[in-house]
């Protein structure tokens, strides 16, 4: 009984290994085209701004109709969590991303400038690319 279980486990492991070996490999190549996106092309927005009239009606003219899309841009504040020793994550290979109050837009994560150091060395960057480039 135990021999059959071990044999079935070995067969299952070999099938999984063969399928993983046959899967296409992810290759990093020098692709300078970058991400492509289209956001909000031809979009329009309408708001149901209400108005109250009459005697003793609450007229909040400061907020009424003007607070439909509030945007309070607050940047990253480098505050030390541990105390006197500031610990910070330095993003060396990627770009610093900071997008605030941008409607119908995309902030795409791309490779930073330091990630492209070996891009033009063909033996390192485009190995296995198949002659494209």
From Swiss-Prot:
Main location: secreted
Induction: During aerial hyphae formation.
Signal peptide (from-to): 1-28
Disulfide topology: none
Database matches in InterPro entries: RdlA/B-like (IPR047736)
The keyword Secreted appears for this protein: yes
UniProt KW keywords: Amyloid, Cell adhesion, Cell wall, Secreted, Signal
Cellular localization per UniProt: Secreted, Cell wall; Spore wall
Positions of the UniProt region annotated as Amyloid-forming: 45-57, 59-70
Region spans: Required for amyloid formation: 45-70
Disruption phenotype: A single rdlB mutant does not form the rodlet layer on spores; disruption can be complemented by rdlB from S.tendae or S.griseus but not by any rdlA. Decreased levels of rdlA mRNA. A double rdlA-rdlB deletion shows no effect on spore germination, growth rates, differentiation of aerial hyphae into spores or surface hydrophobicity on a number of media, but spore surface rodlets are missing and cells adhere less strongly to a polysytrene surface. In the double rdlA-rdlB mutant chaplin proteins are still correctly localized to the cell wall of aerial hyphae.
GO biological process: cell adhesion
A GO CC term assigned to this protein in UniProt: spore wall
Entry's free-text remark on domains: The mature protein has 2 regions in the N-terminus capable of forming amyloid rods of slightly differing conformation; intact protein makes longer fibrils. Amyloid formation depends on polar residues between amino acids 45 and 70.
Function: Forms part of the rodlet layer on the spore surface; despite their high similarity both RdlA and RdlB are required for rodlet formation. Plays a role in cell adhesion to polystyrene plates. Forms amyloid-like fibrils in vitro composed of stacked beta-sheets.
Family the entry assigns: Belongs to the rodlin family.
Designated name of the protein: Rodlin protein RdlB
Species, as recorded: Streptomyces coelicolor (strain ATCC BAA-471 / A3(2) / M145)
